[in-house]
Structures are given as structure tokens and as C-alpha cells.
Amino acid sequence: MFDAGLPVALVVSDRPCRGLDLASDRGTAAELIERTDFSSSFDRDEYTHGVVSVLGRHKIDVVAMAGFGTVLGQSMFDAFPQRVINTHPALLPAFPGWHAVRDALAYGVKVTGCTIHVATPVVDDGPILAQEATPVEPDDDESSLHERIKHIERRLYVETLQDILRRGFVLASPDQEE
């Protein structure tokens, strides 16, 4: 997103990652809100409140999620209604969840791809903004297919975010449609 010239105001991650380093190198605010509790008693609402607080402090308008590994609670979507964008390595609604590429291969699909969508409290279930397909090659394994999808996903995500910035909104209300 940095290389595409998108205005990145803040990078937040739930674990140490390259994105935090890139932000720091470019003088962009970066926050690690690490999830340390992986027990069944994990307080998702408390964690989400922390994320929403950080985003609010930085006056964030649109949240572009990429690789954020913690499912966030309802307060995220209340604070940013229809303004949390996510990417997924499958053609939703097919193969939602963490193992989309593996699931697509196991099912035997001949075509898969990626989806850019509005995130909601239900994982991988929001309105679809963009999709792009790619064939599954005979010699593909999970790694090779996922790499090809990620290449498409990065480009499509940037194009979708640029379109959102150009239009000034994520989803059109009936009076905004062209």
C-alpha cells in the first residue's frame, strides 16, 4: 500500500510483522496491539476496544485489514460502519475461514481467486467489493497457489482502495450510485 501511494495514516498489527517496520521506516504511525491470550477465556470485546481506541486516537476513516489474525468484536463494526475492508484468498462465499486455499484444493476446484469485501462481525461474510479468479494449475500445492493468489490480491486490494478514495465512500447508498 505504501508503494502504491495510498495514504496510510497508521499500521496496527496483532503480532510483530514487516508492516510495522515499513511504517516505521516511512515515518508512519505504527502500533503493536499484541494478542497474548489464546485461551478460551480470551476477552474479544476488551481487545477490540483497545484496537478501536487506537484507531480513534489517530482519526482513522477507513480500515484496510491485511493479515490481521484476530477476529474483532462488534464494537469495531459499530465504530467503523461499512468502513472496514478485508481481503480473502478465495472467491467468497466459497471457502470462508483460515484455510481457504487448502479447502479449495481439497474440494478440487479448477478456479479460485481472491475477494475484497466489507468486513462484518461474521467472518468473511460482508458485501463483496471486488473479486478476481485464477486457474488452479495441475501441479499447484497450497503454497504455490497461495503465492499466486497473494500476488493478485495485493494488486486488487490497491485498486479497490484507490477506487474507494476516488469515490469518497465504500458502499454506495441509492442516491450515490452512478
Residue locations for each model-derived region?
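One-carbon transfer enzymes
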Residues: M1-E178
